[in-house]
């Protein structure tokens, strides 16, 4: 599916992952989210954004186990065909119900999209809207011209699924199921989005096209002022439906998939800026996930100014000693200086409330990939506490208060000084020392002393504390996280699950 975006050939943007597969299934809608975009872009942003959906499942390819008994292999092959036929029939029923469920307003929008792009109806058949946000709307569509283009982005191997090895073909013909439809997610980007924002997202997706667990860009089209991006249609579950029932090994697998994606992104010096459950599409059945929505992503250092957090300790002490706050500390006066000659600080504050790192709230002007690690830590805290959302602040001040309630005012003051900010509060609910993550988890899950944490749970909390370190310089990296003992649990459990499934499939 070749296309052209402002003269940029986007036909070769998809990865050639021959060691992975994915299946395309029904989408599950998730919740609305509110985006906090940077001050420089407030004219573009709206108050609420519903996460745009694309669905996914990755299945790692392992060594194929040969069947030495031809009759057993024939029986196994027939079982595969029967199961696939059942899935196909269920998919046709689901698709039929989807078509009936589209309301008139959505149908009008879909008809307009198809009419705005010449030849659109010959390539795609829109089925329904699966996401709507501040900057775009996402639709599920059938790829009518799938067989006419290079689909190396599609990890599914139909020939291996339907046809057994030549030496073991069944003697009697077996009816081949109807080839199931191929779906894509079509992201229509609003004309209110700046061209630079659109181009930035597509360029980043192009750079990440070979990365595991990252949603690839198939192609993109522009007609006059209308821009659409074509993405794979990935399967995932609703985070709210499964996160409370996850076991520690399952949590480890989930986080391992997420940090695999983060490592790929961070290796390219890219900040995602919007890590949250609805932007990491995870399928609990296959235990595979994919990172999506790079609308707020940017390259590290693209808009940086020096910040104290990256200076030496001696330089920070010198700057703090000569600050306005230090000069007034002997005789502090309430309020703000009447004639403040200091220039206002402007920094990127993009992200979703409840998932933004402390340095984003403190307006750090030199933000790095560590902001994504904090957000991943919030996801882990959400899962272990069984509370979603865990942080539910309405603005930056409330967000800092929520964090200070856990970490204590002393550590929050130190975190603020790292970025040249002063954190002061007189709220009685915020203590000096804060609370340990272990206590937070026990209180949130209503567990008493009769139900102490298991060794695996303590390992998970240790990993959580490494992710939610207030000092971004001391926060764990994605590469280090993948070597952590907690995420190694997920690798062992995933391998065990695979070999158990292989053994079951032989019989």
Please annotate each region the language model reported.
Residues 184, 210-219:
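Conserved HxN/HPN-centered segment at the entrance to the catalytic loop
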Residues 266-283:
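Catalytic-loop of the protein kinase fold
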């Amino acid at each position: 599916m070749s296309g052209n975006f402002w003269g940029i050939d986007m036909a070769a943007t998809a990865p050639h992952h021959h060691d992975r597969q994915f299946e395309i299934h029904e989408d599950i809608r998730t919740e609305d989210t509110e985006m906090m975009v940077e001050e420089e872009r407030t004219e573009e942003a709206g108050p609420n954004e519903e996460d745009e959906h694309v669905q996914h499942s990755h299945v790692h390819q392992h060594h194929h186990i040969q069947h030495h008994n031809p009759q057993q292999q024939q029986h196994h092959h027939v079982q595969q065909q029967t199961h696939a036929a059942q899935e196909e029939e269920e998919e046709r029923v689901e698709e039929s119900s989807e078509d009936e469920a589209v309301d008139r307003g959505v149908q009008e929008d879909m008809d307009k999209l198809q009419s705005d792009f010449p030849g659109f109806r010959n390539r795609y058949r829109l089925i329904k809207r699966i996401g709507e946000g501040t900057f775009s709307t996402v639709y599920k569509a059938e790829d009518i011209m799938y067989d006419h283009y290079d689909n190396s982005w599609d990890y599914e191997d139909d020939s291996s699924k339907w046809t057994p090895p030549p030496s073991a073909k069944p003697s009697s013909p077996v009816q081949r199921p109807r080839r199931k439809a191929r779906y894509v997610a079509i992201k229509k980007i609003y004309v209110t989005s700046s061209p630079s924002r659109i181009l930035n997202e597509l360029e980043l997706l192009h750079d990440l096209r070979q990365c595991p667990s990252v949603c690839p860009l198939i192609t993109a089209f522009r007609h006059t002022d209308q821009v659409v991006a074509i993405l794979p249609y990935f399967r995932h579950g609703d985070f709210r439906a499964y996160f409370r029932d996850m076991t520690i090994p399952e949590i480890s697998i989930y986080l391992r998939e997420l940090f695999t994606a983060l490592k790929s992104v961070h290796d390219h010096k890219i900040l995602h800026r919007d890590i949250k459950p609805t932007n990491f599409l995870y399928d609990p059945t296959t235990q595979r996930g994919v990172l999506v929505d790079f609308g707020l992503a940017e390259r590290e250092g693209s808009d940086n100014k020096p910040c104290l957090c990256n200076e030496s300790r001696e330089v920070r002490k010198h700057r703090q000693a000569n600050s306005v706050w230090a000069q007034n500390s002997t005789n502090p006066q309430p309020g703000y200086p009447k004639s403040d000659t200091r220039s206002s600080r402007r920094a990127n504050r993009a992200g979703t409330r409840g998932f933004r790192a402390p340095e984003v709230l403190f307006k750090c002007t030199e933000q790095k990939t560590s902001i994504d690690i904090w957000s991943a830590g919030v996801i882990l805290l959400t899962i272990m506490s069984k509370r979603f959302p865990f942080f539910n602040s309405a603005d930056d001040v409330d967000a800092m208060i929520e964090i200070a309630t856990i970490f204590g005012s002393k550590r929050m003051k130190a975190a603020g000084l790292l970025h040249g900010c002063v954190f002061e509060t007189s709220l009685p609910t915020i203590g000096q020392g804060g609370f340990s993550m272990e206590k937070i988890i026990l209180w949130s899950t209503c567990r008493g002393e009769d139900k102490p944490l298991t060794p695996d749970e303590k390992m998970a909390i240790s990993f959580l504390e490494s992710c939610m370190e207030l000092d971004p310089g001391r926060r764990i990296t994605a590469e280090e996280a993948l070597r952590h003992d907690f995420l190694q649990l997920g690798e062992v459990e995933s391998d065990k699950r695979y070999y158990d499934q292989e053994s079951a499939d032989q019989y």
